[in-house]
Curated annotation (Swiss-Prot):
Keywords: ATP synthesis, Cell inner membrane, Cell membrane, CF(1), Hydrogen ion transport, Ion transport, Membrane, Transport. Pfam families: OSCP (PF00213). One of its GO terms (cellular component) is proton-transporting ATP synthase complex. InterPro entries: ATP_synth_OSCP/delta_N_sf, ATPase_OSCP/dsu. It is found in: Cell inner membrane. It is a peripheral membrane protein. Belongs to the ATPase delta chain family. F(1)F(0) ATP synthase produces ATP from ADP in the presence of a proton or sodium gradient. F-type ATPases consist of two structural domains, F(1) containing the extramembraneous catalytic core and F(0) containing the membrane proton channel, linked together by a central stalk and a peripheral stalk. During catalysis, ATP synthesis in the catalytic domain of F(1) is coupled via a rotary mechanism of the central stalk subunits to proton translocation. This protein is part of the stalk that links CF(0) to CF(1). It either transmits conformational changes from CF(0) to CF(1) or is implicated in proton conduction. GO terms for molecular function: proton-transporting ATP synthase activity, rotational mechanism. It comes from Xanthomonas oryzae pv. oryzae (strain PXO99A). Its main location: membrane. The keyword Membrane applies. F-type ATPases have 2 components, F(1) - the catalytic core - and F(0) - the membrane proton channel. F(1) has five subunits: alpha(3), beta(3), gamma(1), delta(1), epsilon(1). F(0) has three main subunits: a(1), b(2) and c(10-14). The alpha and beta chains form an alternating ring which encloses part of the gamma chain. F(1) is attached to F(0) by a central stalk formed by the gamma and epsilon chains, while a peripheral stalk is formed by the delta and b chains. This is ATP synthase subunit delta.
Length: 175
């Protein structure tokens, strides 16, 4: 486990608790995604380390225009603790906790070519049956897979790609 994730964990849990209490999961997701993207930019990361940048200015820089008072206070706490650079990890932890609370499995389906909606619906139905939860699918295309697909749910990876099958075949022949 990386040190950044360890340091970000209490902030991710705090953000989740505030959003759950206010019933504002989606706005917090949007705000954290915005702030994480901004904080993840190398130029902004360097700026955040500059002592000439005040905490209020840092919060203003990282807050989305529609941010509520709770979110601005949350960013202020991160700024006070000099943890604004952890926003990408905080956002990831928050999304994981949100998915758990909403009984949703987030899956990334990477295929060699674009998949039809029918194929994605079939995969979603199979994953829902396997995990007993709703499925939120994100797609990606990677031509190096040659054919097939790789399904990544975070905890479980199902490699049905030709590239993966060839690698397993090569490994078994080598032993």
């Amino acid at each position: 486990m990386s040190q950044a994730l360890t340091l970000a964990r209490p902030y991710g849990r705090a953000a989740f608790a505030i959003a759950r209490e206010g019933g504002t999961f989606a706005p917090w997701s949007d705000a954290l995604a915005f702030s994480a993207q901004v904080a993840g930019d190398p130029r902004v990361a360097a700026l955040l380390l500059n002592p000439a940048l005040g905490q209020e200015q840092a919060v203003t820089l990282l807050a989305p225009p529609q941010a509520g008072e709770d979110y601005l206070c949350f960013l202020g706490v991160l700024a006070d603790a000099q943890r604004l650079s952890l926003l990408p990890e905080v956002a990831g932890l928050y999304e994981h906790l949100r998915a758990e609370a909403e009984h949703v499995v987030k899956a990334t389906v990477t295929s060699a070519a674009a998949m039809s909606q029918t194929e994605l619906d079939t995969i979603a139905a199979a994953l829902k049956k396997r995990f007993g939860r709703d499925v939120d699918i994100t797609t990606a295309v990677d031509a190096s897979l040659i054919g097939g697909a790789v399904i990544d749910t975070g905890d479980v990876v199902i490699d049905g790609s030709l590239k993966g099958k060839l690698a397993r075949l090569q490994s078994s022949l080598a032993h």
